[in-house]
Amino acid sequence: MDLRNFGLSNFGLEPQLLSTIQDMLDFADDHDRAGRAPPEQPIRAYVRDAKAMAATPADVKEYPNSYVFIADMPGVKAAEIKVQVEDDNVLVVSGERTEREKDEKDGVKYLRMERRVGKFMRKFVLPENANVEAINAVYQDGVLQVTVEKLPPPEPKKPKTVEVKVA
């Protein structure tokens, strides 16, 4: 369950409290009463994937020779970002923002927490003319830009000429 969909901030609840409650609900969704993560089940994996995808907005641009995917990922280290191609035509951008653990170890106390931590993911079905062998990913200033080059257009088929023989 995602509390942000219920507009609870309108009832005077602080974002930090909502974030803590959301974390508790996420943990409860992903663990049994003894605190163990259950064996991977397709439904749970789908729900986690859907949450991660909903929390990762992206822009997609088409240029004459390429497609460009842009996602804001402030606070994420480049080493925590994965760019992959699945099933020959699905671009997957995924990773995890884990700063919360580091801060807690250093004795830092959050007064307000609005930036999302945890896993993120986006999947994009690539068009037929996308060249999956020519993908470039650049991460700079908290913005990931993935460029997928287009395949050259196929040459038009030339008509086949059949020689007519005299019988």
UniProtKB/Swiss-Prot annotation:
Keywords: Cytoplasm, Stress response. Induction: By heat shock. InterPro entries: A-crystallin/Hsp20_dom, HSP20-like_chaperone, Small_HSP. Its main location: cytoplasm. Disulfide bonds: none annotated. It comes from the Eukaryota. One of its GO terms (cellular component) is cytoplasm. It is found in: Cytoplasm. Residues 49-167 form the sHSP domain. PANTHER family: HEAT-SHOCK PROTEIN 20 FAMILY MEMBER. Belongs to the small heat shock protein (HSP20) family. This is 18.8 kDa class II heat shock protein. The lineage of its organism: Eukaryota, Viridiplantae, Streptophyta, Embryophyta, Tracheophyta. The gene is SHSP-2.
